[in-house]
Amino acid sequence: MSLNTQIPEVLWAQRSNKDDAEKNVIYLTVLIPDAVDPKINLTPEKLVIDSKSGANAHYAVQIDFFKDIDVEKSKYSVTGRYIFFVLYKKELQEEFWPRLTKEKLRLHWLRTDFDRWVDEDEQEAQPEVSPFGAGGMPDLSALGGMGGMDFSQFGNLGGAGAGEDASDSEPELEEEEEVGSNEKKE
């Protein structure tokens, strides 16, 4: 049985920093569901991925990068839905790459990852989050909390007191005879 090769959808975003290599990265998400034994070849100039997906699908893509990346520092993770890469740019620069690929073509399978995208002029103001998942619980200390509330003081508040039932103030309902009962009431 011959498998048709498909090009997977690829999402990308980037950060740039001329002083900190850790903030000079490309985030790349290659959408291959249920990737089976993916073959990944990462060089400074390009990324080549070839993988089966499930029983009937085959995916392959080659991305020739706009500039070189640092292969030694770069890393990836394979999940059940995609392959996620953090690729470190080799050249430290403040400006964003104008595009991911060398070619100035509009590639139908390549899209901006707006979940990870930050505008070039706003990237320093963004909090650092783990690229491999949600950043955990946010810091709520700035919200001020409950203002030192002492819950032990709630016991002295009024309301229905001990032994007093709130339903005592309502009139009693008359008991109704059961209709259709075979038993004789005495």
Curated annotation (Swiss-Prot):
<feature type="domain" description="CS">
    <location>
        <begin position="5"/>
        <end position="101"/>
    </location>
</feature>
<dbReference type="GO" id="GO:0051087">
    <property type="term" value="F:protein-folding chaperone binding"/>
</dbReference>
<dbReference type="GO" id="GO:0005829">
    <property type="term" value="C:cytosol"/>
</dbReference>
<dbReference type="InterPro" id="IPR007052">
    <property type="entry name" value="CS_dom"/>
</dbReference>
<comment type="function">
    <text>Cell cycle regulatory protein that interacts with cdc2 in the control of the M-G1 transition.</text>
</comment>
<keyword id="KW-0131">Cell cycle</keyword>
<dbReference type="GO" id="GO:0006457">
    <property type="term" value="P:protein folding"/>
</dbReference>
<dbReference type="InterPro" id="IPR045250">
    <property type="entry name" value="p23-like"/>
</dbReference>
<protein>
    <recommendedName>
        <fullName>Protein wos2</fullName>
    </recommendedName>
</protein>
<dbReference type="GO" id="GO:0051131">
    <property type="term" value="P:chaperone-mediated protein complex assembly"/>
</dbReference>
<dbReference type="GO" id="GO:0005737">
    <property type="term" value="C:cytoplasm"/>
</dbReference>
<dbReference type="Pfam" id="PF04969">
    <property type="entry name" value="CS"/>
</dbReference>
<dbReference type="InterPro" id="IPR008978">
    <property type="entry name" value="HSP20-like_chaperone"/>
</dbReference>
<feature type="compositionally biased region" description="Acidic residues">
    <location>
        <begin position="165"/>
        <end position="180"/>
    </location>
</feature>
<dbReference type="GO" id="GO:0005634">
    <property type="term" value="C:nucleus"/>
</dbReference>
<dbReference type="GO" id="GO:0051879">
    <property type="term" value="F:Hsp90 protein binding"/>
</dbReference>
<comment type="similarity">
    <text>Belongs to the p23/wos2 family.</text>
</comment>
<feature type="region of interest" description="Disordered">
    <location>
        <begin position="121"/>
        <end position="186"/>
    </location>
</feature>
